[in-house]
Amino acid sequence: MIKTILFDLDGTLLNTIDDLADAANWVCTQHGWPTFPVETYKHFVGNGIPKLVERFSPENARTPEQLAATLAEFSARYDAHKEDKTAPYPGILELLAALKAEGFQTAVFSNKADAFCGKIIEHYFGPDSFSLVRGSRPGVPTKPDPAGVYSLMADLGADPQSTLFVGDSDVDILTGHNAGLPALGVLWGFRGEAELTAAGADALAAKPEDILAYLRCEKH
Protein backbone atom coordinates (compact mmCIF):
# COMPACT_ATOMS: atom_id res chain seq x y z
CA MET A 1 0.00 0.00 0.00
CA ILE A 2 1.34 3.42 -0.96
CA LYS A 3 2.10 5.69 1.98
CA THR A 4 4.68 8.10 0.50
CA ILE A 5 4.56 10.05 -2.77
CA LEU A 6 7.69 11.58 -4.29
CA PHE A 7 6.83 14.37 -6.73
CA ASP A 8 8.90 15.80 -9.52
CA LEU A 9 8.71 19.61 -9.51
CA ASP A 10 8.88 21.25 -12.95
CA GLY A 11 6.05 20.09 -15.19
CA THR A 12 4.41 18.13 -12.37
CA LEU A 13 3.62 20.47 -9.49
CA LEU A 14 4.53 23.79 -11.10
CA ASN A 15 4.35 25.11 -14.64
CA THR A 16 7.78 26.73 -14.70
CA ILE A 17 8.51 26.55 -18.40
CA ASP A 18 7.87 30.21 -19.31
CA ASP A 19 10.25 31.54 -16.65
CA LEU A 20 12.92 28.98 -17.58
CA ALA A 21 12.58 29.81 -21.28
CA ASP A 22 12.59 33.56 -20.64
CA ALA A 23 15.78 33.36 -18.56
CA ALA A 24 17.50 31.15 -21.11
CA ASN A 25 16.50 33.33 -24.06
CA TRP A 26 17.63 36.44 -22.18
CA VAL A 27 21.09 34.88 -21.84
CA CYS A 28 21.07 33.91 -25.51
CA THR A 29 20.14 37.46 -26.50
CA GLN A 30 22.98 38.93 -24.41
CA HIS A 31 25.46 36.84 -26.40
CA GLY A 32 23.82 37.17 -29.80
CA TRP A 33 22.94 33.47 -29.84
CA PRO A 34 19.79 32.01 -31.41
CA THR A 35 16.77 31.88 -29.11
CA PHE A 36 14.23 29.06 -28.91
CA PRO A 37 10.43 28.81 -28.59
CA VAL A 38 8.89 27.64 -25.34
CA GLU A 39 7.92 24.30 -26.89
CA THR A 40 11.59 23.55 -27.55
CA TYR A 41 12.48 24.24 -23.91
CA LYS A 42 10.00 21.56 -22.85
CA HIS A 43 12.51 19.10 -24.32
CA PHE A 44 15.59 20.96 -23.07
CA VAL A 45 14.58 20.70 -19.40
CA GLY A 46 14.37 17.62 -17.20
CA ASN A 47 18.02 16.72 -16.69
CA GLY A 48 19.07 19.62 -14.48
CA ILE A 49 20.05 23.23 -15.10
CA PRO A 50 23.64 22.51 -16.26
CA LYS A 51 22.24 20.27 -19.00
CA LEU A 52 19.66 22.94 -19.92
CA VAL A 53 22.47 25.48 -20.27
CA GLU A 54 24.44 23.10 -22.46
CA ARG A 55 21.43 22.54 -24.69
CA PHE A 56 20.66 26.20 -25.35
CA SER A 57 24.32 27.16 -25.79
CA PRO A 58 25.68 26.99 -29.35
CA GLU A 59 28.32 24.37 -30.04
CA ASN A 60 31.09 26.98 -30.19
CA ALA A 61 30.28 28.09 -26.62
CA ARG A 62 30.46 24.77 -24.82
CA THR A 63 33.92 24.62 -23.31
CA PRO A 64 33.82 23.85 -19.57
CA GLU A 65 34.78 27.45 -18.80
CA GLN A 66 32.14 28.90 -21.10
CA LEU A 67 29.42 26.62 -19.78
CA ALA A 68 30.32 27.49 -16.18
CA ALA A 69 30.07 31.20 -16.97
CA THR A 70 26.77 30.75 -18.80
CA LEU A 71 25.41 28.65 -15.95
CA ALA A 72 26.18 31.44 -13.48
CA GLU A 73 24.59 34.01 -15.78
CA PHE A 74 21.46 31.92 -16.30
CA SER A 75 21.15 31.08 -12.60
CA ALA A 76 21.29 34.73 -11.56
CA ARG A 77 18.70 35.73 -14.16
CA TYR A 78 16.39 32.84 -13.34
CA ASP A 79 16.66 33.42 -9.59
CA ALA A 80 15.52 37.02 -10.10
CA HIS A 81 12.60 36.06 -12.35
CA LYS A 82 11.63 32.52 -11.31
CA GLU A 83 8.23 33.65 -10.01
CA ASP A 84 7.20 35.97 -12.88
CA LYS A 85 4.95 33.50 -14.71
CA THR A 86 5.29 30.26 -12.76
CA ALA A 87 2.17 28.84 -11.09
CA PRO A 88 0.91 25.54 -9.68
CA TYR A 89 -1.03 23.49 -12.20
CA PRO A 90 -4.82 23.61 -11.72
CA GLY A 91 -5.88 21.14 -9.05
CA ILE A 92 -2.44 20.67 -7.48
CA LEU A 93 -3.16 22.65 -4.31
CA GLU A 94 -6.38 20.69 -3.82
CA LEU A 95 -4.55 17.41 -4.42
CA LEU A 96 -1.88 18.20 -1.84
CA ALA A 97 -4.52 19.18 0.72
CA ALA A 98 -6.40 15.92 0.11
CA LEU A 99 -3.24 13.84 0.38
CA LYS A 100 -2.38 15.49 3.68
CA ALA A 101 -5.91 14.95 4.99
CA GLU A 102 -5.74 11.26 4.09
CA GLY A 103 -2.40 10.79 5.85
CA PHE A 104 -0.04 10.43 2.90
CA GLN A 105 3.56 11.58 3.29
CA THR A 106 4.71 13.77 0.40
CA ALA A 107 8.13 14.96 -0.75
CA VAL A 108 9.69 16.66 -3.76
CA PHE A 109 12.65 15.28 -5.71
CA SER A 110 13.90 17.37 -8.62
CA ASN A 111 16.89 17.81 -10.90
CA LYS A 112 16.53 21.56 -10.36
CA ALA A 113 19.27 22.99 -8.13
CA ASP A 114 18.51 22.35 -4.46
CA ALA A 115 18.59 26.06 -3.55
CA PHE A 116 16.00 26.89 -6.21
CA CYS A 117 13.75 24.02 -5.12
CA GLY A 118 13.50 25.14 -1.52
CA LYS A 119 12.78 28.75 -2.43
CA ILE A 120 10.18 28.05 -5.07
CA ILE A 121 8.33 25.39 -3.07
CA GLU A 122 8.08 27.65 -0.03
CA HIS A 123 6.88 30.55 -2.18
CA TYR A 124 4.05 28.64 -3.85
CA PHE A 125 3.12 26.02 -1.25
CA GLY A 126 4.30 27.33 2.12
CA PRO A 127 7.06 26.17 4.47
CA ASP A 128 5.47 22.92 5.71
CA SER A 129 3.72 21.64 2.60
CA PHE A 130 6.06 18.66 2.09
CA SER A 131 7.96 16.43 4.51
CA LEU A 132 11.14 17.03 2.50
CA VAL A 133 12.17 18.99 -0.59
CA ARG A 134 15.30 17.79 -2.34
CA GLY A 135 16.93 19.12 -5.49
CA SER A 136 20.19 18.54 -7.32
CA ARG A 137 23.20 18.71 -5.00
CA PRO A 138 26.95 18.44 -5.61
CA GLY A 139 28.21 14.88 -5.41
CA VAL A 140 24.79 13.28 -5.87
CA PRO A 141 23.91 11.95 -9.35
CA THR A 142 20.84 13.50 -10.95
CA LYS A 143 17.76 11.60 -12.06
CA PRO A 144 17.32 8.99 -13.43
CA ASP A 145 20.11 7.66 -11.19
CA PRO A 146 18.34 6.25 -8.10
CA ALA A 147 20.95 7.37 -5.55
CA GLY A 148 19.08 10.53 -4.62
CA VAL A 149 15.81 8.64 -4.26
CA TYR A 150 17.43 6.11 -1.93
CA SER A 151 18.79 8.94 0.21
CA LEU A 152 15.44 10.72 0.26
CA MET A 153 13.53 7.57 1.22
CA ALA A 154 16.00 6.86 4.01
CA ASP A 155 15.48 10.36 5.40
CA LEU A 156 11.70 9.92 5.15
CA GLY A 157 11.71 6.46 6.70
CA ALA A 158 10.02 5.17 3.55
CA ASP A 159 10.55 1.94 1.62
CA PRO A 160 10.13 1.07 -2.09
CA GLN A 161 7.09 -1.12 -1.48
CA SER A 162 5.08 1.82 -0.10
CA THR A 163 6.46 4.71 -2.18
CA LEU A 164 5.21 6.12 -5.50
CA PHE A 165 7.16 8.37 -7.87
CA VAL A 166 5.13 10.95 -9.82
CA GLY A 167 6.47 12.97 -12.75
CA ASP A 168 5.89 14.24 -16.27
CA SER A 169 8.82 12.81 -18.25
CA ASP A 170 10.61 9.61 -19.15
CA VAL A 171 13.37 10.69 -16.76
CA ASP A 172 10.87 10.52 -13.88
CA ILE A 173 9.49 7.13 -14.88
CA LEU A 174 13.03 5.74 -15.20
CA THR A 175 13.98 7.28 -11.86
CA GLY A 176 11.13 5.53 -10.11
CA HIS A 177 11.80 2.20 -11.76
CA ASN A 178 15.56 2.42 -11.18
CA ALA A 179 14.81 2.83 -7.47
CA GLY A 180 12.35 -0.06 -7.47
CA LEU A 181 9.25 2.14 -7.19
CA PRO A 182 6.04 2.26 -9.19
CA ALA A 183 6.00 5.40 -11.32
CA LEU A 184 2.95 7.42 -12.37
CA GLY A 185 3.12 9.82 -15.31
CA VAL A 186 1.15 13.07 -15.44
CA LEU A 187 -0.20 14.27 -18.78
CA TRP A 188 -0.37 18.01 -18.04
CA GLY A 189 3.40 18.55 -17.98
CA PHE A 190 6.17 19.25 -20.47
CA ARG A 191 6.24 15.94 -22.32
CA GLY A 192 3.25 13.73 -23.12
CA GLU A 193 1.50 10.39 -23.12
CA ALA A 194 3.63 8.78 -25.83
CA GLU A 195 6.89 9.42 -23.98
CA LEU A 196 5.49 8.31 -20.63
CA THR A 197 3.99 5.15 -22.07
CA ALA A 198 7.19 4.29 -23.92
CA ALA A 199 9.12 4.72 -20.67
CA GLY A 200 6.86 2.16 -18.99
CA ALA A 201 4.70 4.32 -16.71
CA ASP A 202 2.68 2.12 -14.34
CA ALA A 203 -0.25 4.53 -14.53
CA LEU A 204 -1.16 7.86 -16.12
CA ALA A 205 -3.03 10.83 -14.69
CA ALA A 206 -4.84 13.29 -16.94
CA LYS A 207 -5.64 15.57 -14.01
CA PRO A 208 -4.40 15.80 -10.40
CA GLU A 209 -7.47 14.15 -8.91
CA ASP A 210 -6.62 11.02 -10.92
CA ILE A 211 -3.59 10.58 -8.65
CA LEU A 212 -5.86 10.50 -5.61
CA ALA A 213 -8.13 7.99 -7.33
CA TYR A 214 -5.13 5.79 -8.12
CA LEU A 215 -3.94 5.89 -4.52
CA ARG A 216 -7.39 5.05 -3.18
CA CYS A 217 -7.57 2.06 -5.51
CA GLU A 218 -4.16 0.91 -4.27
CA LYS A 219 -5.58 0.77 -0.73
CA HIS A 220 -8.05 -1.93 -1.71
Regions found by a protein language model. Name each.
Residues 1-43:
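Active-site neighborhood of HAD-like aspartate-dependent phosphohydrolases
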Residues 30-60, 90:
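Alpha-helical substrate-recognition element adjacent to the catalytic core
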Residues 46-80, 98:
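A metal-dependent, Asp-based hydrolase signature
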Residues 80-108, 114-118, 146:
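Short, acidic loop-to-helix structural element flanking the phosphoryl-transfer center
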Residues 84-87, 113-166, 170-179, 193-195:
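Substrate-recognition "cap/lid" segment bordering the active-site pocket of phosphatases
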Residues 188-198:
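Short, glycine/polar-rich helix-capping loops at beta-to-alpha or helix-loop-helix junctions
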Residues 203-207:
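Short acidic-hydrophobic, aromatic-tinged amphipathic segments that line or gate anion-handling sites
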